[in-house]
């Protein structure tokens, strides 16, 4: 299969894992004969011959990945429906003062029914941790003074605990609907609410997906996260080409569509022309721009705000998938040579972020985010499984970069290059993981007494801790752990 070729002769290379292309029998064949036809059925690659050896070296990881994605594909809709029912039930209990209040309201015929999209309908993430206020600065000044960086300055400088708290709370708030976000930003945070954008994104793969797209002189990037930013579609690998070249503009994307009247994302040439005009005029985020995908929507709005506020800087942040998109956003800005915007970037904070690319990608971004002054911090809590995915091994070569701020279950911060147990594998880690999950459950019952009512965990959060006894890496991914780490964290004295 030919690679996607650029005008200067360089090639885009890619590997797409397609679990839907084979059945269970093919999965078995992939396990037994990793270099056979059964294995090749699942892979679309620009250099298939080279990848055969890599599949053979890590066959069990490949097989488990394919099986998990097949299960997710089968159970996707039922899980979505179940999630909606659970979320509605939790909101029903919340707006009626929990179970006893709901029973009383049923007797009185005065049941409050939650409605999606309103300021009282909270996401599951928000129900796990109900805190809305930002960190109290007076409480911050009473205790710890060492945090993240030795830099000190006025206002929200990198390394300031208030800034990190704002980032982690913004990451939590991003799971909510527009009305909830607007209410919290205006009433609790006393800040200006810019807007809420429901960007169109194609289906993105899970962290168990090992598909990648390689940009010459930049490195390999996880395809699922590129899709989530709206920068391509694995159904047509050529679609990434137009978005990932230097000086990419929406006009150039339109000109690349030589057949028919639609772009690789289903947008008409006339629509793209209107979007391009809006970008050139720094106008506003129209519905057409919002639909075009997250990257262009955010870049347009950010450019407009930076023009209005000449001395302003901005921070990019996110949790889990949002963390992956947070670090890829400045990466694509650099690729597109948006140096004026990059010059206004204060930093990037991610929480529980999965790996987004290979070692070369990290080396490409180091001059912009790591050296000479670190501006990219990955916050990792204890046994959180997500930062350990996709696996970092010799077959797939996914690597983290930037400064890792690792917090153990005592909320002690360690500044490291890589979190311990980087692939969440190994018998020697298994028993400590389960013991730690038990400690976290016990800790959750005591937090309200040891640290004050602000840190008291509700029944739903404690239930998640109980589930964590069976799946410790999943419960550790909760934002409650990250908020507590930011607010209670103390710097390790041994490092």
Model features per residue range: what roles?
Residues 2-317, 321-495:
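Non-catalytic, mobile gating and regulatory segments of ester bond hydrolases
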């Amino acid at each position: 299969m030919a690679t996607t070729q650029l005008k200067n002769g360089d090639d885009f290379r890619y590997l797409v894992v397609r679990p839907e292309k084979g059945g269970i029998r093919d999965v078995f064949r992939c396990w037994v004969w990793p270099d056979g036809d059964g294995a090749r059925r699942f892979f679309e690659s620009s250099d298939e011959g080279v990848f055969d050896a890599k599949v053979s070296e890590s066959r069990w990881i490949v097989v488990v990945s394919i099986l998990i994605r097949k299960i997710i594909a089968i159970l996707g809709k039922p899980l979505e429906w179940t999630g909606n029912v659970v979320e509605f039930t939790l909101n029903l209990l919340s707006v009626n003062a929990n179970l006893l209040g709901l029973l009383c309201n049923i007797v009185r015929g005065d049941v409050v029914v939650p409605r999606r999209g309103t300021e009282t309908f909270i996401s599951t993430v928000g129900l796990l941790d109900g805190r809305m206020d930002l960190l109290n600065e007076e409480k911050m000044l009473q205790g710890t003074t060492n945090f993240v960086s030795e830099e000190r300055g006025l206002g929200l400088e990198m390394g300031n605990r208030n800034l990190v708290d704002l980032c982690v709370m913004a990451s939590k708030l991003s799971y909510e609907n527009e009305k909830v976000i607007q209410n919290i930003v205006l009433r609790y945070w006393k800040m200006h609410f810019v807007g809420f954008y429901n960007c169109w994104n194609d289906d993105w793969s899970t962290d168990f997906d090992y598909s990648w797209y390689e940009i010459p002189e930049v490195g390999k990037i996880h395809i699922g996260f590129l899709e989530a930013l709206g920068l391509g579609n694995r159904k047509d690998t050529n679609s990434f080409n137009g978005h990932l070249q230097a000086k990419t503009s929406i006009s150039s994307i339109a000109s690349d569509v030589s057949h028919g009247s639609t772009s690789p994302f289903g947008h008409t040439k006339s629509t793209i022309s209107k979007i391009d005009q809006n970008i050139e005029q720094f106008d506003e985020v129209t519905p057409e721009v919002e639909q075009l995908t997250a990257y262009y929507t955010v870049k347009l709005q950010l450019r407009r705000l930076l023009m209005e506020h000449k001395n302003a800087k901005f921070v990019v942040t996110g949790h889990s998938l949002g963390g992956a998109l947070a670090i890829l956003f400045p990466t694509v800005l650099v690729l597109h040579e948006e140096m004026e915007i990059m010059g206004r970037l204060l930093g990037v904070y991610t929480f529980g972020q999965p790996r987004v690319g290979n070692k070369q990608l990290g080396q490409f971004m180091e001059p912009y985010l790591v050296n000479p002054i670190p501006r990219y911090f990955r916050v990792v809590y204890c046994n959180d499984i997500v930062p350990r995915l996709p696996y970092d091994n010799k077959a797939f070569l996914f690597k983290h970069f930037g400064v890792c701020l690792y917090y153990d279950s005592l909320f002690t911060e360690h500044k490291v290059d890589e979190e311990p147990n980087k692939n969440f594998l190994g018998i020697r880690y298994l028993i400590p993981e389960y013991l730690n999950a038990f400690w976290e459950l016990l800790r959750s019952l005591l937090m309200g007494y040891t640290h004050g009512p602000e840190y008291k965990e509700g029944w739903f959060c404690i239930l998640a801790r109980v589930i964590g006894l069976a799946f410790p890496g999943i419960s550790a991914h909760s934002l409650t752990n990250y908020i507590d780490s930011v607010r209670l964290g103390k710097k390790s004295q041994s490092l």
